[in-house]
Amino acid sequence: MGKPAGLNAARKLRNHRREERWADAHYKKRLLGTAYKSSPFGGSSHAKGIVVEKIGVEAKQPNSAIRKCVRVQLIKNGKKVTAFVPHDGCLNFVDENDEVLLSGFGRKGKAKGDIPGVRFKVVKVAGVGLSALFHEKKEKPRA
């Protein structure tokens, strides 16, 4: 059995395609709006939050390291997430109760590399870019 092929087969083809599209994960996610419901960012690319604590996350096997991360409570919805602090020594620029800007980290909302459960990274601290602080182009404002 193949596809219906005939002058009056369009409705059957269209209905079948409509039903089968629900097997596609991207289509289903888009139509049900789960990106807005389930992701902590609520579908947006960046979010601001307040640093709750600094933590070290152990890398997965076969690597052996402690990745420097922070626990952040998002301002928009109060959800707590773990965010990676990139660059060597940049954790020193981040203090508790600082306001940070977070963005995605990794692929399609999943964790990146050997850092388990960490889906976000710190981009700005107290309104200043983390890379600018790292390269000593700017200083963190005094509170």
UniProtKB/Swiss-Prot annotation:
Q: Which UniProt keywords apply?
A: Cytoplasm, Hydroxylation, Nucleus, Ribonucleoprotein, Ribosomal protein
Q: Which residues carry this modification: 3,4-dihydroxyproline?
A: 62
Q: What cellular component GO annotations does this protein have?
A: cytosolic small ribosomal subunit; nucleolus; nucleus; ribosome
Processing after translation: Hydroxylation at Pro-62 affects translation termination efficiency.
Record Gene3D superfamilies: Nucleic acid-binding proteins
Compartments where located = Cytoplasm; Nucleus; Nucleus, Nucleolus
Name any one GO molecular function: structural constituent of ribosome
| GO BP terms in the entry | cytoplasmic translation; translation
Identify the domain of life: Eukaryota
**PROSITE patterns hit by this protein:** RIBOSOMAL_S12 (PS00055)
Q: Which CDD domains does this entry report, sorted A to Z?
A: Ribosomal_S23
Give the protein family.
Answer: Belongs to the universal ribosomal protein uS12 family.
Q: Which NCBIfam families match?
A: PRK04211.1 (NF003254), uS12_E_A (TIGR00982)
Extra facts: There are 2 genes for uS12 in S.pombe.
Main function: Component of the ribosome, a large ribonucleoprotein complex responsible for the synthesis of proteins in the cell. The small ribosomal subunit (SSU) binds messenger RNAs (mRNAs) and translates the encoded message by selecting cognate aminoacyl-transfer RNA (tRNA) molecules. The large subunit (LSU) contains the ribosomal catalytic site termed the peptidyl transferase center (PTC), which catalyzes the formation of peptide bonds, thereby polymerizing the amino acids delivered by tRNAs into a polypeptide chain.
Give the record's subunit note. Answer: Component of the small ribosomal subunit (SSU). Mature yeast ribosomes consist of a small (40S) and a large (60S) subunit. The 40S small subunit contains 1 molecule of ribosomal RNA (18S rRNA) and at least 33 different proteins. The large 60S subunit contains 3 rRNA molecules (25S, 5.8S and 5S rRNA) and at least 46 different proteins.
User: Per its record, how is this protein called by name?
Assistant: Small ribosomal subunit protein uS12A
Species annotation: Schizosaccharomyces pombe (strain 972 / ATCC 24843)
Q: What is the lineage of its organism?
A: Eukaryota, Fungi, Dikarya, Ascomycota, Taphrinomycotina
The gene it comes from is rps23
